Swiss-Prot record:
Lineage of the organism: Eukaryota, Fungi, Dikarya, Ascomycota, Saccharomycotina
Ranges of biased composition (kind: Polar residues): 38-57
Subunit and interaction comment: Component of the ER membrane protein complex (EMC), which is composed of EMC1, EMC2, EMC3, EMC4, EMC5 and EMC6.
Other notes: Present with 1320 molecules/cell in log phase SD medium.
Subcellular location(s) per record: Endoplasmic reticulum membrane
Protein name per Swiss-Prot or TrEMBL: ER membrane protein complex subunit 4
Claim: Endoplasmic reticulum is one of the keywords in the record: yes
Superkingdom as given in the UniProt entry: Eukaryota
GO BP: any one term: phospholipid transport
Keywords carried by this UniProt record: Endoplasmic reticulum, Membrane, Transmembrane, Transmembrane helix
Length: 190
């Protein structure tokens, strides 16, 4: 095994004369990239022009913030809608047999959306408070509640298909009054 010689940079790592012989270009002398407008390209700008530019920029930023808030509100509103196909598929694949996993899944499909509906304001808290976007955020909140309702409906249908929802007359027999059709007459005696 032969010993390798160290790299060139390793030999001259601490040699200051070696570093000085390389011409290092200052980044201030490099040209700006295309489309970049720095302070040097503006030249002589009056105070009024700077104020007008800053007002235009602040108005554009406010408009951009408004647009971003509406987009964020719709992202929040569409989160439950994205889980609807998966929940339908899981509900279908788990079958209608009475087992703990499908029952818990169906109950979670009922309880999760109820909790989410009651915490709608906290879910939309980052985008609330701007009067310019209030109507659009309220529309997104309404759709959020609708999508949560769809998830609850999937859970209800799952529980109904398992027979856990009492919806037939036979499910309520213990609370029915007993009807006597013979008016106290006994037909058979011992």
């Amino acid at each position: 095994m032969s010993e390798q010689e160290p790299y060139e940079w390793a030999k001259h790592l601490l040699d200051t004369k070696y570093i000085e012989k390389y011409n290092i270009q200052n980044s201030n002398t490099l040209p700006s990239p295309p489309g970049f407008e720095g302070n040097s390209s503006k030249g002589n700008v009056t105070r009024k022009q700077q104020d007008a530019t800053s007002q235009t920029t602040s108005l554009a930023q406010k408009n951009q913030i408004t647009v971003l808030q509406v987009q964020k509100a719709w992202q929040i509103a569409l989160q439950p809608a994205k889980s609807i196909p998966m929940n339908i598929f899981m509900s279908y694949m788990s079958g209608t047999s009475l087992q703990i996993i499908p029952i818990m899944t169906a109950l979670m499909l009922l309880s999760g959306p109820i909790k989410a509906i009651f915490s709608t304001r906290s879910a939309f808290k980052p985008v609330l408070g701007n009067k310019a976007t209030q109507s659009q955020v309220q529309t997104a909140m309404f759709m959020y509640i609708v999508f949560q309702g769809v998830l609850m409906y999937i859970g209800y249908r799952k529980l109904n298909s398992m027979g856990l929802i009492p919806n037939a007359k036979g499910d309520w027999l213990p609370w029915e009054r007993i009807a006597h059709y013979n008016n106290g007459l006994q037909w058979f005696s011992d």
